[in-house]
């Protein structure tokens, strides 16, 4: 992509309404535009990152055996009355009526709808286990939307729902999602810690929030710092095997949100030098809620003996759009964003330091064509901005690699390769720059 033809509305000044780093940088980098309180238009740069994150979430859900579908944003109020949650949910749920006076709601979550879909088609235990997920926009009418995508009213979520014949099978499904979440966040360059948490309006008696430690987080958390050193399962993890050892390894180390924190146990089990009491950002939460919805909504299957029983369920959410904010909070410096390569909008930026000069134009065009041909996402800054402005833009938007092409280096047959993560620079031949970025 040539920057001269791209839509990248960089802001020179920090908007006054932006309170935290991620919100400030997303606005300054031209990733978002606020259209109403807590509601944003996703501009091209932000949309590219959003799609990268969404794809990682999708790949890890598929790897764990979940099956993708897509449910509508609008739901019938009667479904929620059937489960008993319509009146219990509160003012965060946007309730509307169509021209025929039918009561609808803009879904904040999908337990009722997925249960209705399940009960319409699945009648036997032989169709289990089953895990269905979708990635869809949600709306919750937050009283005080703030912090950009961290606490917006409209947001993109991945929601998965598991269906099993009994509690033992349902807990195995829970474990699969637990491991899938560890892998998902690690692939994005995040250390997300699973912490015991309240189940809230979803219900049930087992839940973990996945928390990224950050001083700007909305949650107070307590944990043993040893949890930061635990290994994340690799691609070869067997989701059909026994995942209990992995779960025990992660849950035996103390980690809890404020709602379920046990002060005496924390003091007793965690050495003073490993105690962490800080804040964190919730990027995902998983629940086992047993037969709460299946009993209320008559989602029954015939067991091996032919007797109908309510299925045991779980739900598993990832805040896809919120993850952008969490990643920026964890990966930035005074100059801008430092995207992990897996989610960066572009892998590399070519900076023509003397636009219009025949030798630099030719070298940049050669690099651009070769990288595009090899499938590298590359942004070519072919604008007539001065070099300092190009450096500032590339640092602000956080592209992992910058290729600096100037007359002085070309005279020696080299370009400068800069790594955004640590600021390191190296002079390399053009062919070597291409080779590095296509490894």
Curated annotation (Swiss-Prot):
InterPro entries: aa-tRNA-synt_IIb, aa-tRNA-synth_II, aa-tRNA-synth_II/BPL/LPL, Anticodon-bd, Anticodon-bd_dom_sf, Pro-tRNA-ligase_IIa, Pro-tRNA-synth_IIa_bac-type, Pro-tRNA_synthetase. GO terms for cellular component: cytosol. It is found in: Cytoplasm. It catalyses: tRNA(Pro) + L-proline + ATP = L-prolyl-tRNA(Pro) + AMP + diphosphate. It comes from the Bacteria. GO terms for biological process: prolyl-tRNA aminoacylation. GO terms for molecular function: ATP binding; proline-tRNA ligase activity. Its EC number is 6.1.1.15. Keywords: Aminoacyl-tRNA synthetase, ATP-binding, Cytoplasm, Ligase, Nucleotide-binding, Protein biosynthesis. Catalyzes the attachment of proline to tRNA(Pro) in a two-step reaction: proline is first activated by ATP to form Pro-AMP and then transferred to the acceptor end of tRNA(Pro). Belongs to the class-II aminoacyl-tRNA synthetase family. ProS type 2 subfamily. Homodimer. This is Proline--tRNA ligase.
């Amino acid at each position: 992509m040539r920057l001269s033809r791209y839509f990248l509305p960089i802001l020179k000044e920090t908007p006054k309404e932006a309170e935290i780093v991620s919100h400030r940088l997303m606005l300054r980098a031209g990733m978002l535009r606020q259209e109403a309180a807590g509601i944003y238009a996703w501009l091209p740069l932000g949309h590219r990152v959003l799609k990268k994150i969404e794809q990682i979430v999708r790949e890890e859900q598929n790897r764990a055996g979940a099956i993708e579908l897509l449910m509508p944003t609008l739901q019938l109020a009667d479904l929620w009355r059937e489960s008993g949650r319509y009146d219990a949910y509160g003012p965060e749920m946007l309730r509307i009526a169509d021209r025929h006076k039918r009561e609808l709601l803009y879904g904040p979550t999908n337990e009722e709808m997925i249960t209705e879909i399940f009960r319409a088609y699945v009648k036997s235990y032989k169709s289990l286990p089953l895990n269905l997920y979708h990635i869809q926009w949600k709306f919750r009418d937050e009283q005080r939307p703030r912090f950009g995508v961290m606490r917006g009213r409209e947001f993109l979520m991945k929601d998965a729902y598991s269906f099993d014949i009994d509690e033992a099978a349902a807990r195995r499904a829970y474990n699969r999602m637990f491991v899938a979440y560890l892998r998902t966040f690690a692939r994005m360059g995040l250390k997300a810690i699973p912490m015991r948490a309240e189940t809230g309006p979803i219900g049930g008696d087992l839940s973990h929030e996945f928390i990224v430690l950050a001083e700007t987080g909305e949650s107070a958390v307590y944990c043993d710092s040893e949890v930061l050193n635990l290994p994340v399962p690799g691609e070869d993890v067997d989701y059909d095997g026994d995942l209990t050892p992995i779960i025990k390894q992660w849950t035996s180390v103390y980690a809890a949100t404020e709602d379920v924190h046990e002060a005496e146990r924390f003091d007793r089990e965690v050495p003073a030098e490993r105690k962490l009491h800080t804040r964190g950002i919730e990027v995902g939460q998983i629940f086992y809620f047993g037969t709460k919805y299946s009993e209320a909504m008559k989602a029954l299957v015939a067991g091996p003996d032919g007797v109908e029983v309510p299925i045991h369920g779980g739900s598993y959410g990832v805040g896809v759009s919120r993850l952008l904010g969490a990643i920026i909070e964890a990966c930035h410096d005074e100059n801008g964003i430092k995207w992990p390569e897996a989610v960066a909008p572009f892998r590399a930026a070519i900076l023509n330091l003397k636009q219009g000069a025949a030798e630099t134009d030719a070298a940049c065009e050669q690099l651009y064509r070769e990288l595009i041909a090899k499938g590298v996402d590359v942004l070519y800054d072919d604008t007539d901005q001065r070099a300092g402005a190009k450096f500032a833009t590339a640092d602000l938007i956080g592209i992992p690699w910058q290729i600096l092409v100037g007359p002085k280096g070309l005279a020696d047959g080299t370009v400068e390769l800069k790594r955004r993560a640590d600021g390191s620079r190296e002079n390399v031949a053009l062919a070597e720059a291409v080779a590095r970025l296509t490894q």
